[in-house]
């Protein structure tokens, strides 16, 4: 079963943002595929003591949120203060939640495309970026569904700022890499996913990794409940395929 890590963030502006991050989305559970250089750059930024900025972009479901969750988990375990702002859930909070985040060790802004054209959010992110530059200590990670220059931002200065740092496209996994990622996730959860079962899932299901991981969790639970090993006939029975 999936569990979650709660991180409480209290900024100097006295705004509290509780973060609920899946505890299985770590660097150890991320299968890089063709993204080894991206992963190395990200981990290097987290190791350094001064500020650093990386922008990651990809289509939805490629793993960019996983990497931000992993970065938050790694620094949280070191005792550092982190902030994670999922802009696809921006109705949960207001732009002022960014006030004071330049004092944190790490700030992660996920799905920036969701606030394109929103003047208040764009200005809040722009101001935070400038404060982070001045502080010289905070690491900033931002994700989007396209390169910075292609975001439909209303604030040209923000588009320019986002284009300053290291920019990486998160490459999609091949089917072979997806199989490896599924088997890795299974091992971390304490069970084995036979290769033939993994290939069957890739053939019969949506190949989007989030869907595959959810299905893997479902099969794990069903296997434990029924006290049966994962086989293709059992998978067909559970998933009614």
Curated annotation (Swiss-Prot):
GO terms for biological process: DNA replication initiation; negative regulation of DNA-templated DNA replication initiation. Keywords: DNA replication, DNA replication inhibitor. It comes from the Bacteria. Disulfide bonds: none annotated. The keyword Transferase does not apply. InterPro entries: Chromosome_initiator_DnaA-like, DnaA_dom, Hda, Hda_Enterobact, Hda_lid, P-loop_NTPase. Belongs to the DnaA family. HdA subfamily. The active form seems to be an ADP-bound monomer. Forms the RIDA complex (regulatory inactivation of DnaA) of ATP-DnaA, ADP-Hda and the DNA-loaded beta sliding clamp (dnaN). Mediates the interaction of DNA replication initiator protein DnaA with DNA polymerase subunit beta sliding clamp (dnaN). Stimulates hydrolysis of ATP-DnaA to ADP-DnaA, rendering DnaA inactive for reinitiation, a process called regulatory inhibition of DnaA or RIDA. This is DnaA regulatory inactivator Hda. It comes from Citrobacter koseri (strain ATCC BAA-895 / CDC 4225-83 / SGSC4696). The lineage of its organism: Bacteria, Pseudomonadati, Pseudomonadota, Gammaproteobacteria, Enterobacterales.
């Amino acid at each position: 079963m999936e569990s979650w890590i709660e991180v409480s963030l209290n900024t100097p502006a006295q705004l509290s943002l509780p973060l609920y991050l899946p505890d299985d989305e770590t660097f150890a559970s991320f299968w890089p595929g063709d993204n080894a250089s991206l992963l190395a750059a990200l981990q290097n930024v987290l190791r350094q003591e001064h500020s650093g900025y990386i922008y990651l972009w990809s289509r939805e479901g490629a793993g960019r949120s996983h990497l931000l969750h992993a970065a938050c988990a790694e620094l949280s375990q070191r005792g550092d203060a982190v902030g994670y702002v999922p802009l696809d859930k921006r109705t949960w909070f207001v732009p002022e939640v960014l006030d004071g985040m330049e004092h944190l060790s790490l700030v992660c802004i996920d799905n920036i495309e969701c606030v394109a054209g929103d003047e208040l959010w764009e200005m809040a992110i722009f101001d935070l970026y400038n404060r982070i530059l001045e502080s010289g200590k905070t690491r900033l990670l931002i994700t989007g569904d396209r390169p910075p220059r292609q975001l439909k931002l209303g604030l040209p200065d923000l588009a320019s700022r986002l284009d300053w740092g290291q920019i990486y496209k998160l490459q999609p996994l091949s089917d072979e890499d997806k199989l490896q990622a599924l088997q890795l996730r299974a091992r971390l959860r304490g069970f084995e996913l036979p290769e033939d079962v993994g290939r069957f899932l890739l053939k019969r299901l949506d190949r989007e990794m989030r869907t595959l991981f959810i299905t893997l969790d479902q099969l794990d639970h069903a296997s434990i409940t029924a006290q049966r090993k994962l086989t293709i006939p059992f998978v067909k029975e559970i998933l009614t395929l």
